[in-house]
Amino acid sequence: MSEKLDKHILKNGMVLLGERMEGVGSAAFVLALPAGAALLPEGCGGAGNVITDWVFRGAGAMTSRQVVDALDGLGVQRNSAVDSSNTVFSGALEASNLAAAVTVYADVILRPKLEDGQFTLARELAMQELAALADDPRQKVMLDTREQFYPWPLGRSPMGSE
C-alpha cells in the first residue's frame, strides 16, 4: 500500500493533511491548536484542561446539550487533551459524517459561548481530575518525572497544581 498524503495550507496558516485509504468507511481527524501548557502565562497552570471542557458547553447557536447531542448523533468517538505545545481535539467516525462533525468543531473552536456559569462547572471538573491523581500513582509519577526532566515551562503539568 503506497502512502500518499494530501496537504493543503489555509490562508490562516493552518495545515490540513489527509490520507485516503481505499475500502475504509471511517474517518479520523486531529485538530492541534498551539495552546499547550507551556504557552500559558505563569499562574494559569491547568487552564488548558478547563478550557477544553468549557468550549464544549455551548458553541455557535447550540447549547451544551445540543453540542453533545450533535456529536453523539454523528457517531463521533472523541477526545480532547492538552500537552506542552498544543491543545488537541480528535475524533473518529463514519466518513460520510465528517463534514458535519467538522462544522460542529468549527463552532466549538471559533465560536464557543464561554458562559460564566459553565466556567465554574468546567473548573470544578478539572479540580476533581487533579484530586484524582492521588488514586493514580502511575500518572502522578509520570507528571512528576516530566516536570523534573524537561526545562520550564515544557515540563509543566497540563493538569496544573492545587
Feature locations, PLM:
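Acidic-residue sensor for enzyme active/binding pockets
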Residues: 19, 40, 129
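Generic "edge-of-domain/loop-turn" microfeature
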Residues: 15, 23, 36-38, 96-98
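N- or domain-start disorder-to-order transition segments that initiate the globular core
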Residues: 1-26
